[in-house]
Amino acid sequence: METAWSNILNYKNVSDRYILTEKDKKGAFTRQYFEVYEARLKELKPRILENAEREIGKGKFTHSQLSDAKQDEEIFVVGVIVKRIAARPSILKSLLNEDKVAYDDYEEDAEEDEVKRYAGSIEDRIELESDKQTVRLEGNISMDECATGCCVGVLGKLGKEGVFHVNRLVWPSVKVPKKVAVDGTIAFVSGLDLTGDLEDDRLTISGLEFMADWMNVQVGNENQCPPIDRLVVIGPLVETKSNGCDVQSVVRTLTLSRAEKHSSTASLITVDKIINSIAEKPLVNTVDVTPGVGDPCSSMWPLPPIHRVCLPRCGMSDKKVNLVTNPYEFEVNGLRVMTMSGENVSELLRTSLKWTGADAIENIIKWQHVAPNCPDTLDAFPVAERDPLIMDITPHVIICGNQPHAEFRHIPIDGSNCLVVCLPKFSKTRVACFLNLSDLSLKWQNFDHQF
């Protein structure tokens, strides 16, 4: 008989900053973009200057406002990056040119495994906004090392034509937690994308059932699964005919038919049953459920937890099912883990022809911001007094869901390192990831058993 797994890990949810306060919400929808970027720059500027003193040398650079820049004088300016990409589609142009905003071009069966990327152009350029002024950047900077919304310090000179020639870039300082030794296993799945139709969901449901059984079999073979301290289910849990990342997706979401809205309700019932059944397994200690864009919660980053009324069975077992934010950060015995549903990374990949998912996350660590493309190409709640998506501490592990391919990378940071993992959609691959906390090794397991 199976015996329940007793978890000895000290768990702590450290996602408080992703929860919006009443102060954040007050007057939110009267704010402009510049207030969001202003708050971001205000928080990151001291860390950029701190890093500049370490990398360039204290007293070896002149920190100046862009408005005070003189031609051919080397100065250090801190500001926000803006990437001007000619091929980037405009929703305003689409509204003017198409009555239905490309809704007729939506393909029901279109493959979404690969990220659609913007084609490069000689018209593409990089600008820096600082002190309510904008200047074009050239020199020691490329389109593949920055993104719109990044805060950076640039050391260089203002040229004759009003172009700033960059000699050196300085990013915010990085705070890395101490190394810790932890024994245990955490499992991760992402992108269930359930539709509520049993035929459409057949492979996903059978894969989840297979995974639940595999995690609870106590047999002595090489495929034996260790006791699972936590299972983290990364959204989206339900399929919405949309990925929320472009004009067609927005229109598709706004024009769902009655039948499609009904299917969303049915899919929630399916999700509730499956997650609750997994949580009841004796060898699974706790299930964390984090939402994605399209799930029944706000689609503006950071996403709040799904309300328990949407998952009533899970709500009744609150000790084993934990409804959390997106992004979601937690610690187990001091080991810090961050998960995110991946819309931020998918949007970043659109702006580069070279990046992989791991490249994008490595840049996120360098920029010290989870989603610099908020609120430019990714919906974000307009918080003005603070930026909840700034990385105060770089986690030991970052798991990014809903990516085209499985991928991982160890990124060295000041004597420590961060493990970044790109996790594909379970609905398409039936692949789950098992993280060994003692050595941060990964086990990829496929639960696709088609006959």
UniProtKB/Swiss-Prot annotation:
Entry keyword annotation includes Nucleus: yes
Keyword terms: DNA replication, DNA-directed DNA polymerase, Nucleotidyltransferase, Nucleus, Transferase
Family label: Belongs to the DNA polymerase delta/II small subunit family.
Quaternary assembly: Heterodimer with subunits of 125 kDa and 50 kDa.
Molecular-function GO terms, alphabetical: DNA binding; DNA-directed DNA polymerase activity
Domain of life: Eukaryota
Name of protein: Probable DNA polymerase delta small subunit
Cited CDD domains: MPP_PolD2_C
Known function: The function of the small subunit is not yet clear.
Gene3D superfamilies: 2.40.50.430, 3.60.21.50
Entry GO terms, CC: delta DNA polymerase complex
Enzyme class (EC, first level): transferase
EC number: 2.7.7.7
Compartments in which it is found: Nucleus
Any single GO BP term: DNA strand elongation involved in DNA replication
Catalytic reaction(s) noted: DNA(n) + a 2'-deoxyribonucleoside 5'-triphosphate = DNA(n+1) + diphosphate
Pfam families referenced in this protein's UniProt entry, alphabetically: DNA_pol_D_N (PF18018), DNA_pol_E_B (PF04042)
InterPro entries: DNA_pol_a/d/e_bsu (IPR007185), DNA_pol_D_N (IPR040663), DNA_pol_delta/II_ssu (IPR024826), PolD2_C (IPR041863)
Keyword Nucleotidyltransferase: yes
